[in-house]
Amino acid sequence: MEMFQGLLLWLLLNTGGAWASRGPLRPLCRPINATLAAENEACPVCITFTTTICAGYCPSMVRVLPAALPPVPQPVCTYHELRFASIRLPGCPPGVDPMVSFPVALSCRCGPCRLSNSDCGGPRAQPLACDRPPLPGLLFL
């Protein structure tokens, strides 16, 4: 009987983890298309553009006794490989750099958040938007 209980526990633990990570409510960390905004205070317009960013679920843990042990670092969905692309803001006055660079995700991974190249905050209620009049969107993939 003990052997049967052990086997049942092993099956539940092993298949439960795989099922939870593949569920439709938890898409794994991957590149997705996102629309972002680019503007410069000195230029009269804002451009929205579509690029690829990293988004999705990364497995994490929370300690049962948080006061007794140091916190566990929580992984975030972040860039593994990326390249940079640039767009030119139209209508900028002379002497103002009209170029805006942005990252394009080629592949993603779950890892520690590095504030030097990632926004580690949670989901936003409102997407990043333009303060200036927008031009029609561009597509950069």
Curated annotation (Swiss-Prot):
GO molecular-function term, one example from the UniProt record: hormone activity
Signal sequence segment: 1-20
Gene Ontology biological process terms from the UniProt entry: G protein-coupled receptor signaling pathway
Gene: LHB
Any one annotated GO CC term: extracellular space
Function text: Promotes spermatogenesis and ovulation by stimulating the testes and ovaries to synthesize steroids.
Known partners and oligomeric status: Heterodimer of a common alpha chain and a unique beta chain which confers biological specificity to thyrotropin, lutropin, follitropin and gonadotropin.
Disulfide-linked positions: C29-C77, C43-C92, C46-C130, C54-C108, C58-C110, C113-C120
PANTHER family per UniProt: GLYCOPROTEIN HORMONE BETA CHAIN, LUTROPIN SUBUNIT BETA
Localization, UniProt: Secreted
InterPro entries hit by this protein: Cystine-knot_cytokine, Glyco_hormone_CN, Gonadotropin_bsu, Gonadotropin_bsu_CS
Pfam families named among the record's database cross-references: Cys_knot (PF00007)
Source organism of this protein record: Ailuropoda melanoleuca
Similarity field: Belongs to the glycoprotein hormones subunit beta family.
Annotated glycosylation sites: N33
Name by which UniProt lists this protein: Lutropin subunit beta
SUPFAM superfamilies: Cystine-knot cytokines
Keywords from the named record: Disulfide bond, Glycoprotein, Hormone, Secreted, Signal
